[in-house]
């Protein structure tokens, strides 16, 4: 439990500090570049299909310092997966939790809240066809969570083989948004595979952490109207209209009309955006949208690609419409049963930014309450405690005190 709480503390610290990056890269030049000090420890490709050559791109940053007298070579490794579906983890790397934050001038600033301060940090462009990852054909892009997890498992095994010190290091899976499906599916797959493999081929999974995740879409899509109403963002008439659209979405889910359900959810979110006039549903307090187009500009530079081990002709797209289209029918399918499996077999952390109207606190707690897990009554009765970092309010934590804890964290500042 102690190791999970240390991980949790780092997550919350990032919520406060990620926006306070200090400039340390060279001034803007005519073309962006990757300063040597900002380069990943390792980056390149992990082949998932030796026949076709399809591969997952990775960028690994070794821990900056040791923690609690643990050598860096033994520190835990966090594997970050972005959402989408079809969005590159280089967004998380360069705009959220990586050691360097990309600014609008296409230069890099040191991130004092980076998650690799005391952990190794791996960013994977998942699934194939996303970001810098390679899919030799659209037909090879996975269409369900099982096949996505299978590719990721192969990639992780190959990553571990890159350095003999990686083999015994604890591994945690983390990410946000649509990774609320990737992470449970991958954790489930790893545990199942580990039970069938010899010790030397197992993945040393120690826990999972899901941020603002889409995990049980049927329940989560039903929370938007009432949540927005009680925040004062919409009135009763608008609430009734939104609830009607939500029930329409649920109807498609229950009839197994998955494509229609995804389209219906998109209508719910579009309607909510239009009703509120918000810049983004990911954080209702923001006055302008997230400025992430800078990631495409930076990563499509030839010198940057060369530095990362990417071919010059590989076009980077931060969110792939092709991958999103392939997984369109998968979006509204629940993986809650996989989380129910995980809480019995490893550590689970759910963390949410308080300002997220899509998959934030009410959305997450709504599906957590319906989990088939003997720990739920204890969890729901547990005290909700104030979380402080350096004496300042960081959020609130609720956990069930058992051998396999399930924690819910609310970030007072947005985690996204």
Label each PLM-derived region with a short phrase:
Residues 1-416:
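Terminal and linker regions of secretory-pathway proteins
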